[in-house]
């Protein structure tokens, strides 16, 4: 009887343990509230993706995430990858501050208080390299040629430091640089056979890559800053295709001037046009990032709209700077020769190219409705009319918040249609740009009071008819504020980064 009771207890314990154990899909642990803590306790290093099943970015990440999980598991690594459906596990999502999809957190030793946000690229190599940097030495010691070859083959880009004295000042500087870069594997060696294998007879640093010239040898004094600059200049291809996976590398880098070739892969002489673009890129390494975009791909249509381009206008070239403000530039010539592209880049760097501001044609009936229609060509005249108080909505046709606001804005226009000095207006900011106003989120609401000093007041009050009326009747005071606050509110209201109405989302998609 006692034996039977003990057997029942043992079976019950086994059943309970099995019920909570995570399932696996393609080597990725499937977590939920019932097994999350157990997984943290069982695995020293755990990378967790919080996703939504309908999220396009999550779907694009899935195969690379699974590939990374499989690679680590095959190596016998202590690192495991996991995922949580945040739409089903809202408590977990809230606990870990999930505001967009995918959100990826790295847990070390079961620490739930301060998991580290994953910020590197979305290819398997990027994920693996980032995790290894977080769990091991900044640079692995390469004791023989096989170890060095394995490191070089493990990733699209790898960096090896060759130092006969691994305690030298140069070697220490190398380690400092290695600690800064998360998504590239670093190795260090003093082995003479490894020196010979890669044709080095003295100390040096080599960046190996599976594209372009294959390797770059560092020249000069080895310092952390110079090494970081060397890697920045050489880690990306001369020309990189924009994809879901390459986007973090493109926008996470230090090069903030990008020239874009919108090139349909179906176009005649596709290879020739791409070759011209690549030839031009050789003169601007580390200064301008050369990117090509398949303009036929449906996922890239928003980017074309952002630049005011239509598919039938491609191939085409545009340049953009991604500093505090995004500024676009358009070549004077439509020729896509290497010479013309090179000349355009030189003129831009010399400050001889003016920003390109888009504008639609002015509709004949732009002022016939209570809400006036503004485009780039009539904005200055209407918004800065010294005798009128002009309240403008800057919107995007695809923006959900703008669609919700539209009937209220129309009622506001109706309210003031006969007012002697108040004008209600709107402008499609995806097709029109003006130098006086930089739009960072949609909708952006700005008030231009009647005056000669070109004052602009941001509206950050309630988006209601009463709220707008109080603002106008108070002369632009009741509801005035910094539009940065509104941007944060929009992100809080709509946590899906894929549908984020912030113009920065377009930057992420470029």
Curated annotation (Swiss-Prot):
Belongs to the protein disulfide isomerase family. The record marks 56-57, 400-401 as: Contributes to redox potential value. It comes from the Eukaryota. PANTHER family: PROTEIN DISULFIDE ISOMERASE (PTHR18929), PROTEIN DISULFIDE-ISOMERASE (PTHR18929:SF101). Coiled coil: none annotated. It catalyses: Catalyzes the rearrangement of -S-S- bonds in proteins. Heterodimer; heterodimerizes with the protein microsomal triglyceride transfer MTTP. Homodimer. Monomers and homotetramers may also occur. Interacts with P4HA2, forming a heterotetramer consisting of 2 alpha subunits (P4HA2) and 2 beta (P4HB), where P4HB plays the role of a structural subunit; this tetramer catalyzes the formation of 4-hydroxyproline in collagen. Also constitutes the structural subunit of the microsomal triacylglycerol transfer protein MTTP in mammalian cells. Stabilizes both enzymes and retain them in the ER without contributing to the catalytic activity. Binds UBQLN1. GO terms for cellular component: endoplasmic reticulum; endoplasmic reticulum lumen; external side of plasma membrane; melanosome. The keyword S-adenosyl-L-methionine does not apply. This is Protein disulfide-isomerase. GO terms for biological process: peptidyl-proline hydroxylation to 4-hydroxy-L-proline; protein folding; response to endoplasmic reticulum stress. It is found in: Endoplasmic reticulum; Endoplasmic reticulum lumen; Melanosome; Cell membrane. Transmembrane segments: none annotated. Phosphorylation of Ser-359 by FAM20C is induced by endoplasmic reticulum stress and results in a functional switch from oxidoreductase to molecular chaperone. It also promotes interaction with ERN1. The active site is at 55 (nucleophile), 58 (nucleophile), 399 (nucleophile), 402 (nucleophile). Its main location: endoplasmic reticulum. Disulfide bonds join 55-58, 399-402. A motif (Prevents secretion from ER) lies at residues 507-510. The modification Phosphoserine is found at residues 333, 359, 429. The modification N6-acetyllysine is found at residue 202. The record marks 122 as: Lowers pKa of C-terminal Cys of first active site. InterPro entries: PDI_thioredoxin-like_dom, Prot_disulphide_isomerase, Thioredoxin-like_sf, Thioredoxin_CS, Thioredoxin_domain. Residues 473-510 are annotated as: Disordered. The record marks 463 as: Lowers pKa of C-terminal Cys of second active site. GO terms for molecular function: procollagen-proline 4-dioxygenase activity; protein disulfide isomerase activity; protein heterodimerization activity.
């Amino acid at each position: 009887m006692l034996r039977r009771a003990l057997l029942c207890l043992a079976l019950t314990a086994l059943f309970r343990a099995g019920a909570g154990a995570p399932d696996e899909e393609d080597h990725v642990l499937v977590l939920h509230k019932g097994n999350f803590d157990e997984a943290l306790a069982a695995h020293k290093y755990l990378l967790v993706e919080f996703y939504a099943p309908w999220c396009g970015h999550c779907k694009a990440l899935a195969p690379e995430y699974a590939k990374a999980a499989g690679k680590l598991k095959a190596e016998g690594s202590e690192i495991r990858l996991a995922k949580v459906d945040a739409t089903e596990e809202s408590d977990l999502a809230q606990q870990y501050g999930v505001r967009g999809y995918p959100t990826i957190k790295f847990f070390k030793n079961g620490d739930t208080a301060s998991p580290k946000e994953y910020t590197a690229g979305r290819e398997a190599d990027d994920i693996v390299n980032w995790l290894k940097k977080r769990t091991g030495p900044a640079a692995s010691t390469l004791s023989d040629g096989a170890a060095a070859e394995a490191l070089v083959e493990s990733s699209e880009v790898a960096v090896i430091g060759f130092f006969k004295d691994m305690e030298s000042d140069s070697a220490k500087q190398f380690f400092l640089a290695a600690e800064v870069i998360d998504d590239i594997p670093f190795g260090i060696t003093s082995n003479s056979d490894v020196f010979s294998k890669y044709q080095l007879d003295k100390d040096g640093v080599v960046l190996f890559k599976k594209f372009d010239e294959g390797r770059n040898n560092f020249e000069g004094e080895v310092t952390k800053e110079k090494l970081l600059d060397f890697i920045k200049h050489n880690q990306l291809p001369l020309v990189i295709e924009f994809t879901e996976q390459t986007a973090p590398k493109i926008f996470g880098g230090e090069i903030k001037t990008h020239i874009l070739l919108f090139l349909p892969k179906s176009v005649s002489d596709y290879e020739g046009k791409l070759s011209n673009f690549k030839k031009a890129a050789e003169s601007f390494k580390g200064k301008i990032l050369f990117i090509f975009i398949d303009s036929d791909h449906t996922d890239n249509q928003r980017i074309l709209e952002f630049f005011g381009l239509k598919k039938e206008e491609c191939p085409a070239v545009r340049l953009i700077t991604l500093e505090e403000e995004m500024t676009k530039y358009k070549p004077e010539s439509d020729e896509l020769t290497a010479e013309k592209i090179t000349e355009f880049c030189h003129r831009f760097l010399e400050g001889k190219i003016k920003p390109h501001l888009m504008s639609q044609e002015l509709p004949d009936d732009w002022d016939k409705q209570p809400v006036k229609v503004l485009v780039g060509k009539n904005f200055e005249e209407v918004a800065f009319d010294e005798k009128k108080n002009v309240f403008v909505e800057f919107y995007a046709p695809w923006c959900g918040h703008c669609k919700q606001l539209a009937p209220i804005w129309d009622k506001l226009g109706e309210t003031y249609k006969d007012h002697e000095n108040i004008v209600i207006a709107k402008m499609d900011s995806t097709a029109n740009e003006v130098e006086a106003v930089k739009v960072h989120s949609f909708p952006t609401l700005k008030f231009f009071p009647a005056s000669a000093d070109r004052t602009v007041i941001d509206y950050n009050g309630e988006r209601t008819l009463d709220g707008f009326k109080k603002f106008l009747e108070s002369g632009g005071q009741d509801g005035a504020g910094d539009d940065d606050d509104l941007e944060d509110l929009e992100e809080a209201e709509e946590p899906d980064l894929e549908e984020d109405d912030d113009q920065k989302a377009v930057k992420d998609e470029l």
